[in-house]
Amino acid sequence: MQRVQPSAARVKSQKKEKAPPDVPDVILDGERKTRYEKGKFLGKGGFAHCYELRNKSTGELFAGKVVPKALLIKQYQRDKMAQEVQIHRNLQHRNVVKLYHFFEDKSNVYITLELCPRRSLMELHKRRKAVTEPEARYFTYQIVEGVLYLHNLKIVHRDLKLGNLFLNDELQVKIGDFGLATTCDNDERKKTLCGTPNYIAPEVLNKIGHSFEVDLWAIGCILYILLFGHPPFESKSLEETYSRIKNNNYVIPTSASAAASQLIRVLLDPVPSRRPNARAVCRDHFFKSGFMPARLPVSCLTMVPHLNDDEYAEENVSPSGTIDQRGPHQAGRSGLSAIPAHLVSRNSERQQTHRMEAYRQPTDCYLSNLLAQVNDLLATPTADIDDAEAALDSYQSPEALPVFWISKWVDYSDKYGIGYQLCDNSVGVLFNDNSRIMLDTAGTQLTYIEKTEKEHYFDMESAIPSGLQKKMTLLKYFRSYMNDHLLQAGQQVTRKVGDDLARLPTLRVWFRTKSAIVLHLSNGTVQINFFNDHIKMVLCPLMQAVTFIDENKRMFTYKFSHLAENGCPEKFLHRIQYAKCMIQRLVEEHTKEETKHNAPAANAVRLPSTSSNVRLESAADIQPAYPSSSRR
């Protein structure tokens, strides 16, 4: 295999890369006599690297922000960090990341923070682009509540953006990173030029003085990104972006509801004094104009939620019902009356159609995108340097970890299909007739997908249609088999509010070779499990990253761009080359099916295996009968 030496520029850039801090495996907070065990790497930004920390006495988990003292040489750097801690340490709000402690040793400064395992809205944006209006209401309302709390304490955040809005396991928004935050009196105006280009307010760029209003401008940008998938003033150059901001040059897509458009316009008003304050935004009609979930399931991080027709329709017309008295951030599906179909205008129907187009995936579920990304990586001259493997830890990208992957599978395709378990313990079956069935972790929500992609949702507490009973029996058999033979016993999971919104990724296509099993999920990820050493490889076209899971369940994630720039070690390179061949095969099969049927072919199929001559029996005689309430 031909290997190419890195260019001088690349070697230079590698040397410039900040080395990770020297962090001991056990960290001592001497003042509190507390010991923390260093866990997995969480990410980096600025001078800091973040690790999961476990209190050795209590077992509690924290996010540990570590800054080497060697990088805090100048007084202004030390002052900036002291101010960040001083502002953040006393904040107590459900929508603000909690800062617990601040301490140091001879080498590093440590800050222990509330752990947010579901990363940030930035990762959600990369996977989903535009989200539904109910989701936008859910996230934006929490952001505004957190900002209202800060403003009541005379704190201006000044760097609100997707990457600083973190998510816990319940997908609650937590405002974090107070590195640019400042305190401000009502009539005071700050002159510092600070912020992030796509979110920065015009008064900051024009240096006329700024205050609390910059946070409301940023919320307008965030709401716009959530709804339409890109920043309102984004361009190919920083100069052009700033020009658009100064001239208030942006366009609201016609798919937006009237309430969303109006809120965006007032938040992005170029005159700061005309923007509403955070309290007024909390009362805005947008949050009452349609369905707002009380809670969102984790599947929303990667899949469009399951919303019924009424909930989509509510986005576009004034609701005939009202938010219940629990407050808009707590209102569930029962909080709004259904809108009669005859009240939805033709224009609303067009808006709904346009918006649904924005959520629709390509028919190949991103296979062609992934193939292009892998081709680009393999076409890049690979750095053949002695320390390429040693340097891997410094450019891991844990923020790009997959949300879902297949943890277990069992092949009964000679008669029925393939059963599998996702990493959240939900269980599914891809039948030989290309239909799919999925049962969530709690065992309460059932999804059935016809080979035509029509979806049906059922509550397990209600009657399942008689036509589905045979497939339900098979699902239970697969689930029982995996529980008895493959899975470790997990804790009992109870049903939660919002579980009915979940749309879990399902297995679309799979095949086996002599070396591996190849699995393609409906959220775009391709997973390859190697038989000889039990390594799993998960490639994600949306995060443009690859994750390796070893036999000890340790996960290592790298962005394709980082592997291209810093060098791809031999142990990864040959697997990625193998993945390219497998993805190429998936793409070719999709193209063949699409041509054959002369229509979008997102149907789930098993490709012929290269390692066996298993006969695939048809299950076409299983034709379920659906109740009239079945939903797409």
Curated annotation (Swiss-Prot):
Its EC number is 2.7.11.21. ATP binds at residues 42-50, 65. Expressed in oocytes. Residues 1-26, 313-334 are annotated as: Disordered. InterPro entries: Kinase-like_dom_sf (IPR011009), POLO_box_1 (IPR033701), POLO_box_2 (IPR033695), POLO_box_dom (IPR000959), POLO_box_dom_sf (IPR036947), Prot_kinase_dom (IPR000719), Protein_kinase_ATP_BS (IPR017441), Ser/Thr_kinase_AS (IPR008271). CDD domains: POLO_box_1, POLO_box_2, STKc_PLK. Residues 36-287 form the Protein kinase domain. Keywords: ATP-binding, Centromere, Chromosome, Cytoplasm, Cytoskeleton, Kinase, Kinetochore, Meiosis, Nucleotide-binding, Nucleus, Repeat, Serine/threonine-protein kinase, Transferase. Its cofactor is Mg(2+). GO terms for biological process: meiotic cell cycle; mitotic spindle organization; regulation of meiosis I. Signal peptide: none annotated. The active site is at 159 (proton acceptor). Disruption phenotype: Mutants are viable and fertile but about 30-percent of the progeny die at the embryonic stage. Surviving adults are mostly male. Impaired chromosome pairing and synapsis during meiotic prophase. Asymmetric disassembly of the synaptonemal complex fails at the diplotene stage. Partial mis-segregation of chromosomes. Increased germline apoptosis. Simultaneous knockdown of plk-1 and plk-2 causes a loss in pie-1 polarization in the 1-cell embryo, an increased association with the oocyte pronuclei and a decrease in pie-1 degradation in embryonic somatic cells. Coiled coil: none annotated. Pfam families: Pkinase, POLO_box. SUPFAM superfamilies: Polo-box domain, Protein kinase-like (PK-like). One of its GO terms (cellular component) is nucleus. It is found in: Nucleus; Cytoplasm; Cytoplasm, Cytoskeleton, Microtubule organizing center, Centrosome; Chromosome, Centromere, Kinetochore. Gene3D superfamilies: Phosphorylase Kinase, domain 1, POLO box domain, Transferase(Phosphotransferase) domain 1. It catalyses: L-seryl-[protein] + ATP = O-phospho-L-seryl-[protein] + ADP + H(+); L-threonyl-[protein] + ATP = O-phospho-L-threonyl-[protein] + ADP + H(+). Residues 405-484, 506-588 form the POLO box domain. Interacts (via POLO box domain) with mex-5 and mex-6. Interacts (via POLO box domain) with him-8 (via N-terminus); the interaction mediates plk-2 recruitment to the pairing region of X chromosomes during meiosis. Interacts with sun-1. May interact with nicotinic acetylcholine receptor. Belongs to the protein kinase superfamily. Ser/Thr protein kinase family. CDC5/Polo subfamily. This is Serine/threonine-protein kinase plk-2. It comes from Caenorhabditis elegans.
